[in-house]
Amino acid sequence: MAAPAPAPRILVLLLLLLPAPEGAQSELCMISHGRKVDPWVCPDFCCGNCNDQYCCSDVLKQVMWIEEDCHAPEASILTDDFDSGFDSDPVARFGTVIAIGVTLFVIAVVTVIVCCTCSCCCLYKMCRRPQPVVTTTMATTVTHTPYLQPPSYPGPTYQGYHSVVPQPGMPTAPYPTQPTGPPAYHETMAGGAALPYPASQPPYNPAYMEPPKAVP
């Protein structure tokens, strides 16, 4: 019995390897919706121009893609896609702002550190400039406060003592506050016994006259 001929298998393989007709090829069209240009896969042809394309099956209206003329829509597609994604995601926008702020802060800190350590920087010269020494003289002023004497008040008077007007020719009695003189010579004699002080002779009174003595 003869083996079957492999003609059907070879025919199927050839059909798969043959290129598809023009109308069966899918093309990437640039469909414009306002400012945004979206890529769209057309099963037939892309008709129109580089900026605004649509799907059609007419070969005469097919747009001829030229790299020099149709390069701008691709750039606009990427730009518009990036802008739309950035605007629609507030978290990404906030993260971008934080990243920019942190970067600027780090750059500022590094700049200050470099300027403070480098001798050719103006900030280093400003920080290392010697400060002028200011000498201050302190003067001490002494003020003399006048001594205030306590006010003198009259002392209490002795109620039992009355001043007596001295009589002419009579000795004045010593005041109690006057110190007494040294003791008389006859008071300090041998034996230590003090003699009584004789009474003083009364002063002479011209009005008093002795009676005349009788003559024998």
UniProtKB/Swiss-Prot annotation:
Residues 1-26 form the signal peptide. The chain crosses the membrane at residues 94-114. GO terms for biological process: apoptotic process. InterPro entries: Shisa, Shisa_N. It is a single-pass type I membrane protein. GO terms for cellular component: endoplasmic reticulum; endoplasmic reticulum membrane; nuclear membrane. It comes from the Eukaryota. Residues 27-93 are extracellular. Keywords: Apoptosis, Endoplasmic reticulum, Membrane, Nucleus, Signal, Transmembrane, Transmembrane helix. Its main location: endoplasmic reticulum. It is found in: Endoplasmic reticulum membrane; Nucleus membrane. The proline-rich region is required for endoplasmic reticulum localization. Interacts with PDCD6; PDCD6 can stabilize SHISA5. Belongs to the shisa family. This is Protein shisa-5. It comes from Bos taurus.
